[in-house]
Amino acid sequence: MPLSASLPSKNYDYDYDSVQPYFYFEEEEENFYLAAQQRGSELQPPAPSEDIWKKFELLPMPPLSPSRRSSLAAASCFPSTADQLEMVTELLGGDMVNQSFICDPDDESFVKSIIIQDCMWSGFSAAAKLEKVVSEKLATYQASRREGGPAAASRPGPPPSGPPPPPAGPAASAGLYLHDLGAAAADCIDPSVVFPYPLSERAPRAAPPGANPAALLGVDTPPTTSSDSEEEQEEDEEIDVVTLAEANESESSTESSTEASEEHCKPHHSPLVLKRCQVNIHQHNYAAPPSTKVEYPAAKRLKLDSGRVLKQISNNRKCSSPRTLDSEENDKRRTHNVLERQRRNELKLRFFALRDQIPEVANNEKAPKVGILKKATEYVLSIQSDEHRLIAEKEQLRRRREQLKHNLEQLKNSRA
């Protein structure tokens, strides 16, 4: 039969509806405030901050270990109000070592057991209202105990060592269920022996998809068929608390970082924690953001890594090709500038040499290049005219010498 959070039930199996929205199912949507209003409580409508907090509800608690209490077999299928209050107290918190369904009402931890607050979303008002409802129920239960009413008479005794015999009459279904629980409890390991650490420090994970919602909440719901009881026994046999403890000590870096951030967010002054005796190995943190990382095999991962490296190299080449072109252009421009500077220096030196050869501008260090060229042209033309004049004088002198030589020979002949 599907569980409904909006309709109150007198059966103790559905009494955990009072603790919603701290628990939720995968198939149904629970509305804690609507259920509280239908029950006629004094809770006020939720504030906008509470609506935001409700979107990030706390995780479902793992199921409890099979109970070793058998005195419930003698009671009816519908327990009294005291048993219902005890179930609520068992869900809200208690001592992890205590294996029975009933905690001591006079214990201080029993009265102060409330749900841990989520410090990120400041959802303290909903928890305060829940604590108020539970406190009223506990006060009613203690008053009934003092008056010596039937609630005190329905208090169960200490748990027996062996499984109870199945009773006859209207309590046959409860007896059969407790008998199945006793058989399952014989195969279970006491978590308090090998796992003495509080379970609230580790973020719970999701149960298998086919798990019963009542099993997720840790409520002992009588199985409808024998196959359901066999499935519950198989789930109980799969529990390995030692392996979970070792895995808790050797966590991966991602889980440790996530849990470290959650521990920093938790207030250190709050001693109130939720403790459960049975831990489900197949758990998942739904409050954590969805992981986009996909696990690949080793060979495929190597191929992907090599492909990423090649892609990065090609991208680097594509990105560096414009830079290479720019660097080449800069080198060419730099080389051209150097050569042009050398040419100008050589031309300047030649102008200085030409200026030194021209008498008119030889002593003028600030003579312009155009003036040097003009004076050089004039100087060359003057030198050429002097050359022509000197050549003409030389020819004239040569002729004069020839004439004088001829005259000398004539004189010698005349004397002879």
Swiss-Prot record:
<feature type="compositionally biased region" description="Low complexity">
    <location>
        <begin position="212"/>
        <end position="227"/>
    </location>
</feature>
<keyword id="KW-0238">DNA-binding</keyword>
<feature type="domain" description="bHLH">
    <location>
        <begin position="331"/>
        <end position="383"/>
    </location>
</feature>
<dbReference type="InterPro" id="IPR036638">
    <property type="entry name" value="HLH_DNA-bd_sf"/>
</dbReference>
<keyword id="KW-0553">Oncogene</keyword>
<protein>
    <recommendedName>
        <fullName>Viral myc transforming protein</fullName>
    </recommendedName>
</protein>
<dbReference type="Pfam" id="PF02344">
    <property type="entry name" value="Myc-LZ"/>
</dbReference>
<dbReference type="InterPro" id="IPR012682">
    <property type="entry name" value="Tscrpt_reg_Myc_N"/>
</dbReference>
<feature type="compositionally biased region" description="Low complexity">
    <location>
        <begin position="245"/>
        <end position="259"/>
    </location>
</feature>
<comment type="subunit">
    <text>Efficient DNA binding requires dimerization with another bHLH protein.</text>
</comment>
<comment type="function">
    <text>Transforms avian and murine macrophages and fibroblasts as well as murine B-lymphoid cells.</text>
</comment>
<dbReference type="Pfam" id="PF01056">
    <property type="entry name" value="Myc_N"/>
</dbReference>
<dbReference type="InterPro" id="IPR002418">
    <property type="entry name" value="Tscrpt_reg_Myc"/>
</dbReference>
<dbReference type="InterPro" id="IPR050433">
    <property type="entry name" value="Myc_transcription_factors"/>
</dbReference>
<feature type="compositionally biased region" description="Polar residues">
    <location>
        <begin position="315"/>
        <end position="324"/>
    </location>
</feature>
<dbReference type="GO" id="GO:0042025">
    <property type="term" value="C:host cell nucleus"/>
</dbReference>
<dbReference type="Pfam" id="PF00010">
    <property type="entry name" value="HLH"/>
</dbReference>
<feature type="region of interest" description="Disordered">
    <location>
        <begin position="144"/>
        <end position="174"/>
    </location>
</feature>
<feature type="region of interest" description="Disordered">
    <location>
        <begin position="203"/>
        <end position="267"/>
    </location>
</feature>
<dbReference type="InterPro" id="IPR003327">
    <property type="entry name" value="Myc-LZ"/>
</dbReference>
<feature type="region of interest" description="Leucine-zipper">
    <location>
        <begin position="390"/>
        <end position="411"/>
    </location>
</feature>
<feature type="region of interest" description="Disordered">
    <location>
        <begin position="315"/>
        <end position="336"/>
    </location>
</feature>
<dbReference type="GO" id="GO:0003677">
    <property type="term" value="F:DNA binding"/>
</dbReference>
<dbReference type="GO" id="GO:0046983">
    <property type="term" value="F:protein dimerization activity"/>
</dbReference>
<keyword id="KW-1048">Host nucleus</keyword>
<dbReference type="InterPro" id="IPR011598">
    <property type="entry name" value="bHLH_dom"/>
</dbReference>
<feature type="compositionally biased region" description="Pro residues">
    <location>
        <begin position="156"/>
        <end position="169"/>
    </location>
</feature>
<dbReference type="GO" id="GO:0003700">
    <property type="term" value="F:DNA-binding transcription factor activity"/>
</dbReference>
<feature type="compositionally biased region" description="Acidic residues">
    <location>
        <begin position="228"/>
        <end position="240"/>
    </location>
</feature>
